[in-house]
Curated annotation (Swiss-Prot):
<dbReference type="InterPro" id="IPR001557">
    <property type="entry name" value="L-lactate/malate_DH"/>
</dbReference>
<feature type="active site" description="Proton acceptor">
    <location>
        <position position="177"/>
    </location>
</feature>
<protein>
    <recommendedName>
        <fullName>Malate dehydrogenase</fullName>
        <ecNumber>1.1.1.37</ecNumber>
    </recommendedName>
</protein>
<feature type="binding site">
    <location>
        <begin position="117"/>
        <end position="119"/>
    </location>
    <ligand>
        <name>NAD(+)</name>
    </ligand>
</feature>
<dbReference type="GO" id="GO:0006108">
    <property type="term" value="P:malate metabolic process"/>
</dbReference>
<feature type="binding site">
    <location>
        <position position="119"/>
    </location>
    <ligand>
        <name>substrate</name>
    </ligand>
</feature>
<feature type="binding site">
    <location>
        <position position="94"/>
    </location>
    <ligand>
        <name>NAD(+)</name>
    </ligand>
</feature>
<comment type="subunit">
    <text>Homodimer.</text>
</comment>
<keyword id="KW-0560">Oxidoreductase</keyword>
<keyword id="KW-0520">NAD</keyword>
<dbReference type="GO" id="GO:0006099">
    <property type="term" value="P:tricarboxylic acid cycle"/>
</dbReference>
<comment type="function">
    <text>Catalyzes the reversible oxidation of malate to oxaloacetate.</text>
</comment>
<dbReference type="InterPro" id="IPR015955">
    <property type="entry name" value="Lactate_DH/Glyco_Ohase_4_C"/>
</dbReference>
<feature type="binding site">
    <location>
        <position position="87"/>
    </location>
    <ligand>
        <name>substrate</name>
    </ligand>
</feature>
<feature type="binding site">
    <location>
        <position position="34"/>
    </location>
    <ligand>
        <name>NAD(+)</name>
    </ligand>
</feature>
<dbReference type="InterPro" id="IPR001252">
    <property type="entry name" value="Malate_DH_AS"/>
</dbReference>
<dbReference type="GO" id="GO:0030060">
    <property type="term" value="F:L-malate dehydrogenase (NAD+) activity"/>
</dbReference>
Amino acid sequence: MKVAVLGAAGGIGQALALLLKTQLPSGSELSLYDIAPVTPGVAVDLSHIPTAVKIKGFAGEDATPALEGADVVLISAGVARKPGMDRSDLFNVNAGIVKNLVQQIATTCPKACIGIITNPVNTTVAIAAEVLKKAGVYDKNKLFGVTTLDIIRSNTFVAELKGKQPDEIEVPVIGGHSGVTILPLLSQIPGVSFTEQEVADLTKRIQNAGTEVVEAKAGGGSATLSMGQAAARFGLSLVRALQGEKGVVECAYVEGDGQYARFFSQPLLLGKNGVEERKSIGKLSAFEQNALEGMLDTLKKDIQLGEAFVNK
């Protein structure tokens, strides 16, 4: 199994690469790519960790050598948020980066599963889909927006509030991956109940958690370490499913039946070909139903922005 990380010299990429080097199954290959000249050195640094995961690093304009034979490609390349920016302010720079990298994937490893981490995910996934479509290699079961950070944050915040162990909590999060489009389904956590005020406050905290980190880092970056952990969790789940493990479920932002929007984050059963089944979002509370209806215009606009970027 070969996993490629694009944007591997950045804050998220390095954290992600470290976790994959220590946790991928024995015999896996890990390929690191970034435009930054330091990237082969990051690979050498990680190569000293004693795990049976082969690692190589590649730098420069051409990602092709890193992508050859990849089964999974995780894209974290792009610029990070600064205070006062929201994820959509990143669009102008990151849209071009994602478009270019996905074009290289389309020619080099068109059958790979692709996980997009680069923000704004609501939009960059639509860009990736349109690029793959133009190249005639789009498979909607193999393109994912990685929203796992919203899930791990939800798990952490709920556990803190309710005095539970965080590994006992699994909160499904649906919708998209910014602001109001992030909708944690707090009504679906077994054995945990909330007051209306707790639901409103927790939902807002989960939606604004990225900004909490950006402000706390005081201009020194955005969420890199928790995002690295979230991306590793998603990537490792995908690898396990591709290798035939049954019953692997993760939420991610994918193209579905269009019931809510063309792309929508929901629980997915993963399998040997990527998405095996898009699972129902289940029964929503009145608060959740209202939040879902209220976000769809924003989500659809984010998606259209990405489609238009490729098709202009």
